[in-house]
């Protein structure tokens, strides 16, 4: 509590009690960052009505600058006041900013704490680790043959091996997590053979069109054909008689079998 002394019109002293501010928002930080290939190098979450920095990307612009820290609340980015912005509105703002642009960023320090659930999943965010490039089998064999294991290799963080992609999944860009849905439910082309015929066991069955009046083969023509196969000495008169009998065989409308009449 602070006391201030003021004089009234008659010259008497009056003691006024002044309460200090409950929220001290004067603790602000500001810096200038250059937009790079990884943006500003910040991982930002929506914490109530504020945009809060949860993590810094290793080797990003913010990590190299060293001014911003996890837990800072964004006040302004460039000329835009982002207090009350949602993550979607903030993303639209960053989409119009090109690489190489220098932005002045202003934040609140020690204003609100990072939610506990975001602090526990730090190791599950691949962007917090530095990019790991894939090495081919030939380069790995060359390293095994020429270079032996050293203390630096033993001090390497084993948790980073978790982010290496398996060989069977094909080529993926650096720093891009593998899509489980695309890997499990991807379209796989298979060859299928379909059988077409008049048999009922075929995949595609051909049916006869009964609407058309199709003339069945004449039994006389079959008889003459079999006689020709057995004996080659058939006369021309028997063949002509068979054709004459076939021509005289009419087809009744609406019936599938021919009726032979000789008149």
Curated annotation (Swiss-Prot):
Q: What sequence ranges are listed for the domain PDZ?
A: 30-109
Top-rank taxon, per record? Eukaryota
Check the record and name the InterPro entries matching this protein. PDZ, PDZ_sf, PDZD9
The name this protein carries in UniProt is PDZ domain-containing protein 9
Q: Which organism is it from?
A: Bos taurus
């Amino acid at each position: 509590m602070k006391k201030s002394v003021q004089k009234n019109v008659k010259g008497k002293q009056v003691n006024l009690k002044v309460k200090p501010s409950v929220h001290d928002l004067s603790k602000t930080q500001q810096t200038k960052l250059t937009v790079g290939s990884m943006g500003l190098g910040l991982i930002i979450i929506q914490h109530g009505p504020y945009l809060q920095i949860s993590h810094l990307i290793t080797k990003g612009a913010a990590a190299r600058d060293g001014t911003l820290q996890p837990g800072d609340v964004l006040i302004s980015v460039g000329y835009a006041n982002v207090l009350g912005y949602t993550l979607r509105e903030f993303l639209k703002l960053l989409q119009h900013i090109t690489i190489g642009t220098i932005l002045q960023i202003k934040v609140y320090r020690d204003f609100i704490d990072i939610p506990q659930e975001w602090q526990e999943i730090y190791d599950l965010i691949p962007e917090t680790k530095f990019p790991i490039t894939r090495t081919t089998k030939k380069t790995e064999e060359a390293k095994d043959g020429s270079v032996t294991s050293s203390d630096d290799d033993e001090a390497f963080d084993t948790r980073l091996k978790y982010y290496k992609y398996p060989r069977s999944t094909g080529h993926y860009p650096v720093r891009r997590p593998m899509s489980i849905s695309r890997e499990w439910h991807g379209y796989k082309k298979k060859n299928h053979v379909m059988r077409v015929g008049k048999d009922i066991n075929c995949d595609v069955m051909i049916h006869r069109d009964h609407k058309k009046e199709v003339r069945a083969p004449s039994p006389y023509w079959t008889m003459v054909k079999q006689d020709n196969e057995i004996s080659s000495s058939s006369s021309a008169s028997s063949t002509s008689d068979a054709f004459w009998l076939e021509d005289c065989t009419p087809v009744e409308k609406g019936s599938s079998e021919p009726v032979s009449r000789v008149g």
